[in-house]
Amino acid sequence: MAQCTPKSFDLTGKVALITGASYGIGMAIAKAMAANGATIVFNDIKQELVDKGLASYAEVGIKAHGYVCDVTDEDAVNAMVAKITEEVGHINILVNNAGIIKRIPMTEMSAAQFRQVIDVDLNAPFIVAKAIIPDMIAQGGGKIINICSMMSELGRETVSAYAAAKGGLKMLTKNIASEYGAYNIQCNGIGPGYIATDRKSTRLNSSH
């Protein structure tokens, strides 16, 4: 993955929550933010993934804070945000990174599978942002970054649910920016292409 030049920007004193950042793109974003002074907070759905993430951060000298939380569960998210605020501090930066993809032809995909992708990739960013925005308003502003994917712009075979979710996330990003810009909350989306994360590299290697 691309490396961030230390002190490319100053995040000293800022608390950044990156969802699903126990590995992959989320971890790379978190490491870049930490290199520029941010305090890193992340979540994952299983304790073993949180523990693995904490160990990976510790290996490079980052004291991260990890929480077990299902970001599709509004009550759990509200509880996590309250706990982070109490234990770490007010969240200044949110990166909605957690996501899943199911590569299944549309006619073979069940409605339940479609809903699961929409729930994680679209509903969850709404839930987490909704939980954090009131405190950002009270603190005088904040930053929200949504990982939208190039699939928010393109259609591809076998990813109908993922593309639909990411397209929706792109529009949610625009609406958050429009609705809360007056409160000094900036919301932007990033549409990365194919990134060689550990999981994707494993899948590529196994296909040869």
Give the positions of each predicted feature:
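Alpha-helical segment proximal to the catalytic Tyr-Lys
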Residues: 134, 178-182
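Substrate-binding pocket helix/loop in short-chain dehydrogenase/reductase
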Residues: 105-106, 113-118, 200
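The beta1-alpha1 cofactor-binding region of Rossmann-like NAD(H)/NADP(H)-dependent oxidoreductases
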Residues: 47-48, 68-80, 111
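Active-site helix of classical SDR
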Residues: 129, 165, 173
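Residue(s) in the substrate-gating loop at a strand-loop-helix junction
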Residues: 149
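Conserved glycine-rich cofactor-binding loop
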Residues: 15, 22-23
